[in-house]
Amino acid sequence: MGAAIAAAGLGLVYGGARVGLMGAVADAALAGGAEVIGVLPAVLTGREVEHTGLTKLELVPSMHVRKARQVELADAFLVLPGGYGTMDEMVEVVTWAQLGLHTKPCILFNTAGYWDGLLAFLDTAVEAGFVKAKNRGLVQVAASAKEAVRMVMGR
């Protein structure tokens, strides 16, 4: 994904760690010449090993400020497979879009069907009346890195 982002001439805004899936994405984006900005809460510098090779690393006071800053810096949100932190960020971004606080796309990279369960839940939430049908479209889906980058670019 990082190579595809760089090849498209895009930059990357992410959490700022050098470990895990996003650390690998950041490394690939950097290797391809992309600008990569990390936003890391200062309290996590002892837990998440900050990436020292980024174009820019911003230390912020809290997780809340981190998410707000990432929303401010990003033009779109591409959600890769992940756990609770990924879910937290994705749900907040979609909620803010639902409230009209931004109009930036949120795209799930559904590699190997990773997000199928979440997508089924969203459909159930619409059927049950907890999510408006028009808001279901706030979460877009890409099956490949190429498709995800095209969607980020609005194509």
Regions found by a protein language model. Name each.
Residues 65-100, 107:
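Active-site/ligand-binding-proximal alpha/beta "capping" segment
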Residues 72-77, 127-155:
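A charged, well-structured terminal subsegment
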Residues 18, 42-44, 82-86:
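Short glycine-rich anion-binding loops that position phosphate/pyrophosphate groups of nucleotides
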Residues 40, 80, 94-120, 133-135:
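Short, acidic/small-residue loops that bind anionic groups at enzyme active sites
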Residues 30-33, 53-57, 120-126:
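Short, hinge-like loop/turn segments at secondary-structure boundaries
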Residues 20-27, 114-123:
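Glycine-rich, charge-decorated loop segments at or immediately adjacent to ligand/cofactor-binding or catalytic sites
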Residues 39-77:
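Glycine-rich oxoanion-binding loops at beta->alpha junctions
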Residues 1-35:
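Glycine-rich beta-alpha loop segments
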